[in-house]
Structure formats: structure tokens, C-alpha cells
Amino acid sequence: MPAAQPAGDSLAGRVVGTRVFGFSQGERAGRRDDFVRAVLRGALEAQYRSGMGRADYVDLLTAGSMPEACRLPQRYRADWLESYVSRLLGRDLREFSRLSDPRRLRSLLAGLAAAQGSETVVARLGGAVNLSASTTTSYMELLRALHLVERLPPWTPNLLKREVGRSKYLLTDSALAMRLTRTSPDILKDLVRGGALGGLLEAFVAAELMRQSTWCEERFTISHYRSPDGREIDLILELDDGRVIAVEVKAASSASAADARHLRWLEGRIGDRLVAGVVFTTDDRSRHLGGRLWAVPVAALWELG
């Protein structure tokens, strides 16, 4: 009878695991970015101005977060991204699973890219590429293992209650999402035709915060919220002590009181647990919306930190 194979060393207590992301905007600019720390230190209370507008944010999305791709002209960046996905799904994937279909995985990835910012309906997403719900779920976990996709779970205000609602799955590299959906930067810059910017910008903000969460001073989790009666909040940042920073992302160049209505509702529900409600916009200046609520430029994510 053959001897039992020794179990691999878990390295418990000697190795700390972490998720792998592309460069943050702060890293690209050579500066420290820690938005949560800035909020906790009261940075939102000071008037803040950024020199960026809608077209500038589209350029950031188009460049993406992968160091090699960022430096390339747009035409060659598209070729690089195509090669990157093909090699990752065609060769590297074999290390994780020999039962997967690279073509369907790419179609699934493109479907996720097209739904940036939306709750993921697994049956609908898989049905579009003739996959069962269980296989679709397995494939999405493979895409997470390849660091192409991240899961944004639904937020439950009470830890004693079960998690409710659907997760959001998002591509953390905006350039890859745009490439997979054949989204033109010129269209995104157009106020009439650029409706897709909203979902891409929401995923971009979420990805920036995910990157910052790996080095920030205060530990926090990132999720999204949908109440039983349909109120939605794009991102919930919850600190270890239970305090919350709630985030909405708008592609508009300004924010109105209506854009913050769900944040104001949350403020009424959780009271002092809410440190701040933030509406990110493509405006070039911040505005106080009353109470603990502010509208700020997206660039505050890395310029305030």
C-alpha cells in the first residue's frame, strides 16, 4: 500500500494573502491615496477643486490600470489587451481548470463588462452564452482567480441578519472593460451618446477603493446596498468599528439634492454610524449637500488622500 502523501505546508502565521490589482491613480501619480483616511480627518469640509472634467475621466478609463498597457498609445493598447485576455484564458487558465471553455469564458467576461455597475443576475448572464447557472457561477469564480473580476457583495446593516440581494461582479480594469465591449472613448465623452459612462465610472471608483483598501490606515469592507423597497446605494464602505461611508457615483457634471436622496435616507436610518455620504461626479469642485452629505469630484479619491 503506497504511503500517504504529506499535506502541503499551509504557511499559517508566516504568509499574508492579498488580492492583486493594477495600479491605482495615486500610484500612477506617485502620491499616497487613502480616501477613507481623508474623510475621517474632515477633508470633505474644506472647499476642494480639481482641474478634471468628463473628457479627462474618460481618458483615465481608457488608459486602465495595467502598467504595460497604460504607457501604450490607444491603438497598440487595444492589441495588448486582446493578447492579454487570449493568453490568460487560453493558457494560464489551464492551471486552474481543464474543464472550462475559453471562448465561453471570454463571452461571459464581455457580458460582465457590459453590465458594470449592475447587480449580476447569474441565470440571465449564463443563459446568454448557453451556460447553466451553476457553471456560470463556477466560471465567475475562475475569472476572480485570474484577477480579472471582483465580487461586490450586498450590504447587510445588521450582522445578525443574513446577506440579502445579489452581488455585483465588476472588471477592475476599465480599459479591459471598454475593449471587451468595443466602447469608444469619443462616444463616452459625448453627453448625448455616452450613457455607458455611468456604469464604467461606478466600477472605476469601486476598483480604486478596492486598491486603497489593501494599504489604507483604517480597514474597511466594500459592498453595495439595495433596500427591500428598492432604494439603491452604489457603495458602502464599512469600517471595523461599524461606521459607514456611503457612496453614489454619477457621470453628471453636478449633483442635485435628488442625487443624494438615498444617502439622506440612510443617514436617517443609521444616524451617527454614517461618517459621510459622498456623491462622486465629473464636476471640478466640491459642494456641501447638507448634513453629512457632500458632492465631490471623482479625483478626490486620490487627490484628497
What are these language model-derived features?
Residues A4-A114, S118-E119:
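Interdomain motor-coupling "hinge/lid" segment immediately C-terminal to the ATP-binding subdomain
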Residues R226, F280-T281:
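Short beta-strand/turn micro-motifs composed of small residues
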Residues P2-P6, G26-G30, M178-R179, S256-A257, ...:
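Switch/connector loops and helix/strand junctions flanking conserved nucleotide-binding motifs
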Residues C70-V244:
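Accessory nucleic acid-recognition modules appended to NTPase machines
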Residues S253-L263, G305:
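Active-site-adjacent loop/helix micro-motif of nuclease/hydrolase catalytic cores
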